[in-house]
Regions:
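Non-heme Fe(II)-dependent double-stranded beta-helix
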Residues: 2-24, 30-131
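Conserved hydrophobic/aromatic beta-strand scaffold that supports enzyme active sites
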Residues: 5, 26-28, 119, 140-144, ...
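Hydrophobic side chains in beta-strands
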Residues: 110, 143-144, 157
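Active-site glycine-rich loop that binds ribose-phosphate moieties when present
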Residues: 122-129, 143, 164, 170-174
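Short, conserved beta-strand element in jelly-roll/cupin
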Residues: 128-150
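Double-stranded beta-helix
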Residues: 148-180
Length: 180
């Protein structure tokens, strides 16, 4: 059996959410967004995704669209970033090594049929070796606006790998898919 990411209900306690973040490095909170929010996000993002601009390399995906600067482009995306529950979780998770949080990056991603799986990577790699491994510099969120499955490109997550040594590589059965 392959690895799994724990799913919690939308009303799960902050403590439960943080427990799985700290232990596993990931948790999925189910049914957080209602239909009205999903419709607003779809309405805001559709004009940008209709432009059909795809990645230019294997990492970003030749059949993957990415739209950045979402706070400037979408009121609904801005509301997601400012959700008190998310900010509270991020502040608590990162508190040991920071005074507050800063939004670093926003991106809408649409994966078209025929895309290959992105290579496994650690997001913290954007800092090279400048941030000691004992310091966690990131708290990332992924919001599934449409079904997010292994078959259509759900993000691969290696549960617990945030505690591994840098050179340790995942075995295939250690890879979970952020299906939601």
């Amino acid at each position: 059996m392959s690895a799994q990411i724990t799913h919690l209900p939308a009303n799960a306690s902050r403590e439960d959410q943080l427990h799985f973040m700290e232990e596993d490095g990931a948790v999925i909170i189910d049914d957080v967004l209602g239909n009205k929010q999903l419709q607003a996000l779809d309405q805001d993002l559709t004009p940008f995704l209709q432009q059909k601009v795809f990645g230019r390399d294997a990492f970003t995906g030749f059949y993957t669209q990415r739209v950045g600067a979402l706070i400037a482009r979408s009121k609904a995306c801005g509301e997601l970033a400012l959700r008190p529950r998310i900010l509270d979780a991020a502040r608590t998770y990162l508190a040991e090594h920071c005074d507050d949080v800063q939004l670093h990056f926003t991106s809408a991603v649409a994966i078209a049929p025929g895309e290959s799986a992105q290579i496994l990577h650690r997001d913290r790699g954007i800092w090279g070796g400048y941030v000691p491994r004992q310091i966690e510099p990131l708290f990332s969120t992924i919001w599934a606006l449409t079904p997010f499955t292994r078959e259509n490109g759900a993000t691969q997550v290696v549960v617990g790998s945030h505690r591994w040594e840098k050179k340790r590589q995942a075995d295939p059965d250690e890879i979970a898919y952020a299906e939601m």
